[in-house]
UniProtKB/Swiss-Prot annotation:
Biased composition (Pro residues): 284-297
UniProt GO cellular component terms: cytosol; nucleus
GO biological process terms held by the UniProt record: negative regulation of transcription by RNA polymerase II; skeletal muscle cell differentiation
Classification of source organism: Eukaryota, Metazoa, Chordata, Craniata, Vertebrata
Tissue-wise expression: Isoform 1: Expressed predominantly in the retina. Isoform 2: Expressed in the pineal gland.
Gene3D superfamilies: Ankyrin repeat-containing domain
Protein name: Photoreceptor ankyrin repeat protein
Chain intervals with Gly residues compositional bias: 374-385
Alphabetic keyword roster: ANK repeat, Cytoplasm, Nucleus, Repeat
Length: 385
């Protein structure tokens, strides 16, 4: 019996999915397998393994929102966090445009050497892609991490704020304008005083009203009776805004008991790039190896017989002063049928109009009429009657 030949399958599979590599663990969100692969040691080839779309395991995890996988990959050696797929997307771009705020924060704080200004094939950065998709929280995180708000794309020449306005991302545009008014998180510095600036003025105003109470007028009473209270957004610099600022400051018990800052003298500021946690602690994993230039495979040139290499190019690519021999062109046309032939009579001198053509049947009929006797025509006509 003959053995059946194996035919290639049309299904696209992940690289070495049967060996459970680093990429396999990231795609299947298998935290235990990923930890086992990291404990066993990861080679540079395994860390940079990609699929048919050019995406690494980190990119796939950022795209699907696998937070535990991304957090564990921060300790992976030889991992290039700025690696791009076939469309030019990085892991930060995929997480930002998908709206995974926690993954964007992980990438910004725990991955050393993260490039915020890397562009895709269309010239868009992670900040622009997040602004187009109206991911306001991701936009705020990128701006406070040092993303450049003034950078423009090479096609339309628009910034992230202009892209947000153009794509009707009103929430993102509002958050960007608020950051421009307050570009620094003052509550994350040691010099912050948890006092409400407007408190002294409001207390003095209340005391003045208590000392000299004035009876409300009829109009004020009418307005107080007929006015309706609706839910409003918290005002900037108001009570609720101050409450959030105090509870998120370094002096707040909510933060002091849970975490501590590594650089209290340098709070986050708009447009200022800070160092990641591994860079501050000196525990950054080994950087990825430098990419080697792709090897150019020589392509054999096959020419048609009895033709020069120059004849393989199009006619408009060849030089006009070429002295090579031109191949004659032969055009074949079908001869007209005999019944369609006609002759043109020469135009008499002195006439400017064209003479109509004389057909052969008209010429024969005219000759027959000339050969017949002039009087015989009437006799024949009478005899026939």
């Amino acid at each position: 019996m003959s053995e059946a030949l194996p035919f290639p399958s049309n299904k696209t599979s992940t690289p070495e999915c049967n060996l459970k590599t680093l990429y396999w663990a990231c795609v299947h969100n298998d935290l235990a397998e990923l930890q086992a692969r990291l404990d066993a040691g990861v080679s540079p080839e395994e860390a940079s393994q990609v699929d048919s779309n050019g995406r690494t395991g980190l990119m796939v995890a950022c795209y699907h929102g696998f937070g535990s996988i991304v957090a564990l990959l921060s300790c992976c050696p030889f991992l290039d966090v700025n690696q791009q797929d076939k469309d030019g997307n990085t892991a930060l771009m995929l997480a930002a445009q998908a709206g995974h705020m926690s993954l964007v924060t992980l990438l910004l704080n725990y991955f050393a050497g993260l490039d915020l200004e890397r562009r895709d094939q269309r010239g868009l950065t992670a900040l622009m892609k997040a602004a187009i998709q109206d991911r306001s929280e991701c936009v705020v995180a990128l701006l406070m991490a040092g993303a450049d708000l003034s950078s423009v794309d090479p096609v339309r020449g628009k910034t992230a704020l202009e892209w947000a306005v153009l794509t009707d991302s009103f929430d993102t545009a509002q958050k960007i304008r608020q950051l421009l008014r307050r570009p620094q998180a003052e509550q994350l510095s040691l010099h912050y005083q948890p006092e409400w600036p407007a408190l002294a003025q409001l207390v003095a105003q209340a005391q003045a009203q208590a000392q000299a109470p004035a009876a409300p007028s009829l109009l004020e009473r009418l307005q107080a009776t007929l006015s309706l209270s609706f839910a409003q957004s918290p005002q900037e610099g108001g009570v609720l805004d101050h409450l959030v600022t105090v509870t998120t400051s370094l002096a707040s018990p909510f933060l002091s008991t849970a975490c501590h800052t590594l650089c209290p003298d340098h709070p986050p500021k708009l447009g200022t790039r800070g160092k990641s946690v591994p860079e501050l602690l000196g525990t950054a994993p080994p950087p990825p190896p430098e990419p080697h230039p792709p090897q150019q495979v020589p392509v054999p040139q096959v020419f048609a017989p009895n033709q020069s290499p120059q004849s393989m190019f199009s006619q408009w690519l060849q030089s006009r002063d070429s002295t090579r021999s031109q191949v004659p062109k032969i055009l074949l046309s079908k001869a007209p049928s005999p019944s369609a032939r006609y002759e043109l009579t020469l135009r008499p001198q002195g006439q400017q109009s064209l003479a109509p053509p004389v057909w052969r049947f008209q010429e024969r009929k005219k000759k027959e009429e000339e050969t017949e006797p002039r009087g015989g025509g009437l006799g024949q006509a009478g005899g026939s009657k």
